[in-house]
Every structure is written in structure tokens, then in C-alpha cells.
Amino acid sequence: MNDELINSKENIMLAYTYIEHGKFELLEKPKPEIRDSRDAIVRVTLGSICTSDLHIKHGSVPRAIPGITVGHEMVGIVEEVGSDVTLVKPGDRVTVNVETFCGECFFCRKGYVNNCTDPNGGWALGCRIDGGQAEYVQVPYADKGLNCIPDTVSDEQALFVGDVLATGFWAARISEISEDDT
């Protein structure tokens, strides 16, 4: 086999892709690359299907872009980081946050990261930018969206931190519920 063919396959991955209303397919796609100095590339080790993925399939998410790799519930190992990423490094096991956010805009500074004004902000992974139902995922704002997993926590245990647990915690926080509320 020639080197060109081998190298081209090394840059290809499998990705579960939203094709059109009612249709997903497992496709070969190029592996993601660092596009911004704040990005990280994560090799996905475990992911789950969220109800939001099913909403995309059934046409309930008009902002979902056909051709996008779905999925925003995943854990993995950092493969590569951009030059401005300081909180994670290659080899770290991480959870990936459901929300992508800059941390700098008005909404992020107020804690409403779902309304981040960055084009890749809010629920972007698996909806408007390629998500984690793939072998690899490019994570914008890696220092905001990746959290290291302690060695005592399995991938399966950590999987619920990025969306399932975080969504309930965040909803309670922005609702300004206090300990005295019933």
C-alpha cells in the first residue's frame, strides 16, 4: 500500500452524522484539527445519546445543520491542544461540557453560558458544529469546556457530568434557588 493512501486513512474517522429530517448515517469524515488557539482535540472514549440528538433526528431543532456530527455527551482523552489552552494537556482524561462558551461576553460573565454570543456558543456541539458521536471531536474554548477526570472515576461515571448532572445543577443555579426554598 502506498504512503499516500495510508496517510489519508490516518486522517479519517467514523462519525454519526445528521443527514436530513429523520435520517442519521455513520460516515467517514476527516479527523478534526485545531482551528483556533483555544481549541482542543479529544479522542472520544465513551459517549451517550441524548434526547436532544433524537430531537434533531425528528426535526425539532431547526438550527441543527445537516451534515453535522451529532452528540454532546462524551468523555475522552485530550490528543492535542491549541497554544492558548492552559488547563488541560494531551493525555488528560476529560469530560466535555454540553455548552460551548467564550467566558468573555455579557451572558457568559453573568453565568448564562447557554446564551454565549460567540458563533460557536451555547448548544453548538452536535447541533451547529461537529459533536462527539465520533472517534474525535474538536472542542472550542477548551479551558472552559473540558474538565479533567480523577483517576478514581471511571469514564462511565464521568459521562453524566458534562450534560445530565450539569443541566440540573445549572438550572437550579440560574433559578436562584436557595437552601431555604421549598
Protein language model features and the residues they cover:
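Basic/polar N-terminal segments that are highly enriched at the extreme N-terminus
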Residues: 1-14
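Nucleotide donor/acceptor-binding cores
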Residues: 13, 38, 92, 180-182
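Extracellular beta-rich ligand/substrate-recognition surface
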Residues: 17-24
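Glycine-rich beta-strand-centered segment in the early N-terminal region that forms part
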Residues: 32-47, 60-109, 150-153
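NAD(P)H dinucleotide-binding glycine-rich loop of Rossmann-like/cofactor-binding domains
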Residues: 104-182
